[in-house]
Regions:
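Cytochrome P450 fold signature focused on the C-terminal beta-domain
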Residues: 265-273, 289-308, 387-405
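Cytochrome P450 catalytic-domain helical core, especially the substrate-recognition surface
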Residues: 2-28, 75-202, 419
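Cytochrome P450 catalytic-core helices
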Residues: 237-240, 248-272, 368-387
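Conserved cytochrome P450 catalytic core segment spanning the I/J/K helices
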Residues: 190-252
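N-terminal membrane-proximal hinge/A-helix region immediately C-terminal to the signal-anchor transmembrane segment
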Residues: 1-78
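Conserved cytochrome P450 K-helix E-x-x-R motif and the immediately C-terminal K′/meander segment
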Residues: 17-35, 273-309
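Cytochrome P450 heme-thiolate "Cys pocket" and heme-binding signature region
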Residues: 344-408
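Conserved cytochrome P450 K-helix/beta-meander segment immediately N-terminal to the heme-binding cysteine loop
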Residues: 320-346
Length: 419
């Protein structure tokens, strides 16, 4: 007889409020309480949910025979963060076909190009910052990344209020777990930018030369699905936003990188005139150590038995991304900031999962992870080697229930000067 056991259960008719109140630590707190990496709870109106963590759990979670993504994300997340019918919601051949389109954009040359564009925009911003008494790095980084990613994707911005566009792209990921007016603002920003990009798609398909034929915008607008059909204009807009929005969200990591440089001066000192390997380790440790995505959702595709528990078709399962990155069985001293730990990391796709795990093509690991790393390396290099600044007294605390979590002050810099 196969081994089975009853899972621990987090009592309550609906634990959505505790989940929101505890944020990144909700699953970890209960894993510690139950002394088990898997437990049952009720969320989203009393729906039964399985929460789990660990390397083996991630391997199972990213098994496409056992789990699907369609229908997993709550509607409020689709209405702000992901959009309808984007690559994150697809499964099987349709997902692999769409994901390949994205991965084909992530060539070595294109990753260097986006990093170069970010550095160019950062240098332009430096000229302005030098005239200012202080700047808020998080908001300024959003503006820099908005300009750079629009140039990289080939999105024409003549006559566009770039500060407003930056705000709208930020609204989409900042409002994902919010309620009330903040969430409404995120939905409205998505609707407006989708309409803007749908009009561009129509222009491209009418033969108007609004962008180059080798740009990501053109490639997505003319992409055909597995049936040979052009994507719906709204889906094109969603997928172009799947390049714009996550790139602007790297501003969260830039603020967290600045916090790491401030809090760990010994680690910063090692980056002065260091090689790319040292920067890569610092980037990876920043992504491991600080909170970014809290969980990943999926739905059981068909009944199966794993780790003594019968997973039933249709059950919602949450993988603890933050918890995996701090799991004591996966990381030595998980709550310490140690970039050198990545010197001996085996590059497993299932332990280090700040932006999801598994395979890039067949699985649901974030297609923009390489872009994120490339941009972060370049920005950290600028902050260490190409500019001076003072970090004044301010509230640099991180909220473990606010998603995304950034320093409360937005990370204020004073007396910014280029070196």
């Amino acid at each position: 007889m196969p081994y089975r056991e009853e899972l621990p259960y987090d009592e309550g008719l609906d634990n959505t409020i505790p989940f929101l109140n505890e944020g990144y630590l909700y699953i970890t707190n209960r894993r510690n309480r139950f002394n088990r990496d898997m437990f049952k709870t009720r969320l989203l109106g009393g729906k039964q949910v399985i929460c789990m963590a660990g390397k083996e759990a991630a391997e199972v979670f990213y098994d496409n025979e056992k789990f699907k993504r369609h229908g997993a994300a709550p509607n409020k997340v689709l209405h702000t963060l992901f959009g309808q019918d984007g690559v994150q919601t697809l499964d099987g051949e349709a997902h692999a076909h769409r994901k390949t389109m994205f991965m084909n954009l992530m060539t070595k040359d294109s990753l260097t190009e986006i990093a170069d564009l970010v550095e160019e925009e950062w240098k332009h911003a430096l000229t302005i910052w030098e005239q200012e008494e202080q700047i808020e790095l998080y908001e300024e980084a959003k503006k820099i990344l908005t300009k750079a990613i629009c140039r990289w994707t080939g999105v024409p911005t003549d006559g566009v209020d770039m500060d407003k566009l930056s705000e709208q792209l930020g609204d989409m990921y900042e409002a994902a777990e919010k309620i009330g007016m903040k969430h409404f603002k995120g939905e409205l920003s998505r609707k407006k930018t989708e309409k803007w990009l749908m009009n561009m798609t129509a222009s491209i398909r009418e033969g108007k030369q609004i962008t180059g034929e080798h740009t990501p915008l053109y490639n997505i607008a003319t992409h055909r699905d597995i049936n040979g059909d052009l994507l719906d204009e709204k889906v094109v807009a969603v997928e172009v936003l799947n390049l714009l929005r996550p790139t602007v969200a790297i501003s969260v990591y830039i603020a967290l990188s600045a916090l790491a440089l401030h809090d760990y001066p010994e680690a910063k000192e090692k980056l002065v005139d260091a090689d790319a390997v040292a920067y890569k380790r610092f980037v990876q440790e920043t992504r491991r150590y600080y909170p970014f995505f809290p969980v990943a959702p999926a739905i059981v595709k068909q009944d199966f038995l794993w780790d003594g528990y019968d997973f039933k078709e249709g059950t919602l399962v949450l993988l603890d991304l933050y918890g995996n990155n701090h799991h004591p069985e996966l990381w030595n001293e998980p709550n310490e900031f140690i970039p050198e730990r990545f010197k001996d990391w085996d590059k497993s796709p299932f332990d280090f999962i700040p932006q999801g795990g598994g395979d890039y093509i067949t699985g649901h690991r974030c297609a923009g992870e390489w872009l994120t790393i490339s941009v972060m390396q370049r920005c950290i290099n600028i902050m260490v080697n190409k500019m001076d600044y003072i970090v004044p007294e301010q509230d640099l605390s991180l909220s473990m229930k606010k998603m995304p979590s950034i320093p409360k002050s937005g990370f204020i810099l004073e007396h910014v000067r280029r070196k």
